[in-house]
Amino acid sequence: MSIKAEEISSIIKQQIENYHSELKVSDVGTVTYIGDGIARAHGLDNAMAGELLEFSNGVMGMAQNLETNDVGIIILGPYTEIREGDEVRRTGKIMEVPVGEALIGRVVNSLGQPVDGLGPIETTGTRPIEAVAPGVMQRQSVNEPLQTGIKAIDALVPIGRGQRELIIGDRQTGKTSVAIDTILNQADQDMICIYVAIGQKESTVRNAVETLRHHGALDYTIVVTAAASQPAPLLYLAPYAGVAMAEEFMYNGKHVLVVYDDLSKQAAAYRELSLLLRRPPGREAYPGDVFYLHSRLLERAAKLNDSLGGGSITALPFVETQAGDISAYIPTNVISITDGQIFLQSDLFFSGVRPAINAGLSVSRVGGSAQIKAMKTVAGTLRLDLAAYRELESFSQFGSDLDAATRAKLERGKRTVEVLKQDLHKPLKVEKQVLILYALVHKYLDDVPVHDVLRFESEMNTWFDHNRPELLEEIRTTKKLPDEAKLEAALKEFKNTFVPSEEK
């Protein structure tokens, strides 16, 4: 069989005409240094800041330093398999995390991958972890209360939806307990909660998750964890992942509470990365942009205006102090960014005042306008009374011959401190908080022994639940105090049934 030359040429022409090649152009670099969660690569001249890069073994990294010859990369995963000389290629994408309703009830890492063993998360939505905060005209002032269920906070330093309220104190002063109790109190408040655990022990995170599950709070909570054993890049990214998940809900008109526990560990992780990337150190060896690290995170908490759906993100960042020093670098930075702070003091904690809130140093700059009218009425003078009591208490140690007015103030102060104490994981509904504070302010507790005050409160709540539920309902629905004559009559009736116990 002979093949003609014309046939061969026509077949070749046909093949050439039908040939479609898709050229894949990608920038590829070479790893020149690897170690401590950091890589340096040569040849990625077109890489963008914050771009995701892929190593030859599939591990992802993020471009942080763009230099003349090298790119400094933080590695988002195990880096022990990466070697000098390995390929690293650009992806053209920036870091994104999965978002949406499917995340609720799950425990995820900084990359949004599940770590709770309950299978993959069925969601297709993603959001970039770095986003521009809402502008001035997109916001409205804080006007809705966020009830924490903690008497000392709701009365003295109220928090509104869309506020940033710093919780600051030494280690082991109950910071995490305040956050967990606040999450537990959101059960019927139409609020989604996100708990971001940064640099915590895995056992601590497990305990927090079990507490939330036990009280049914995981039904509206997402837990983002970057444990102490994780590489520093994951600790640095965890808060941004948490707020990206929150923004998805906020822009859909929902209300979100985000707890960052705690930002001093994130700052330490960022310091570690910056020093490894050879950025110049500043005060306390933190890099120059450590303020921006936190400001760009916390500015994303906002109350959106009604045309954008009126959603909100409320942020509760934590900062750990050393020996109560709130004038250190990170504490002063975050105090200046937030709308107030709650200062937890170790002296108060160890003396049995829990939550150990120092009313003198704690402040809420915008929460007052969100406080309900009933609470404003009863808690108006509480802060001043408490401050006066603390002052008198320190003077009274030096002399016993005090006049009757001073003694009365001291006795009232003792009862105020006692009323503001609260058991762990027992948040109190706002109407019951108003009730006990009304009783305190109107001198119903003046003749109750100090050691009986909490029992008085507990029995009073039970009595009102059974005998005067309509008064509690009125406070809850109208957010104002009920008719004073009815309230006084009910309190007197209960007081007659209360039997003080003998002195211990």
From Swiss-Prot:
GO terms for molecular function: ADP binding; ATP binding; proton-transporting ATP synthase activity, rotational mechanism. Keywords: ATP synthesis, ATP-binding, Cell membrane, CF(1), Hydrogen ion transport, Ion transport, Membrane, Nucleotide-binding, Translocase, Transport. Its main location: membrane. It catalyses: ATP + H2O + 4 H(+)(in) = ADP + phosphate + 5 H(+)(out). It holds the Pfam family ATP-synt_ab_N. It is found in: Cell membrane. InterPro entries: ATP_synth_asu-like_sf, ATP_synth_asu_C, ATP_synth_asu_C_sf, ATP_synth_F1_a_nt-bd_dom, ATP_synth_F1_asu, ATPase_a/bsu_AS, ATPase_F1/V1/A1_a/bsu_N, ATPase_F1/V1/A1_a/bsu_N_sf. ATP binds at G169, D170, R171, Q172, T173, G174, K175, T176. It is an enzyme of class 7 (translocase). Its EC number is 7.1.2.2. It is a peripheral membrane protein. SUPFAM superfamilies: C-terminal domain of alpha and beta subunits of F1 ATP synthase, N-terminal domain of alpha and beta subunits of F1 ATP synthase, P-loop containing nucleoside triphosphate hydrolases. The keyword tRNA processing does not apply. The record marks S362 as: Required for activity. GO terms for cellular component: plasma membrane; proton-transporting ATP synthase complex. Belongs to the ATPase alpha/beta chains family. F-type ATPases have 2 components, CF(1) - the catalytic core - and CF(0) - the membrane proton channel. CF(1) has five subunits: alpha(3), beta(3), gamma(1), delta(1), epsilon(1). CF(0) has three main subunits: a(1), b(2) and c(9-12). The alpha and beta chains form an alternating ring which encloses part of the gamma chain. CF(1) is attached to CF(0) by a central stalk formed by the gamma and epsilon chains, while a peripheral stalk is formed by the delta and b chains. Produces ATP from ADP in the presence of a proton gradient across the membrane. The alpha chain is a regulatory subunit. PANTHER family: ATP SYNTHASE SUBUNIT ALPHA, MITOCHONDRIAL. This is ATP synthase subunit alpha 2. The lineage of its organism: Bacteria, Bacillati, Bacillota, Bacilli, Bacillales.
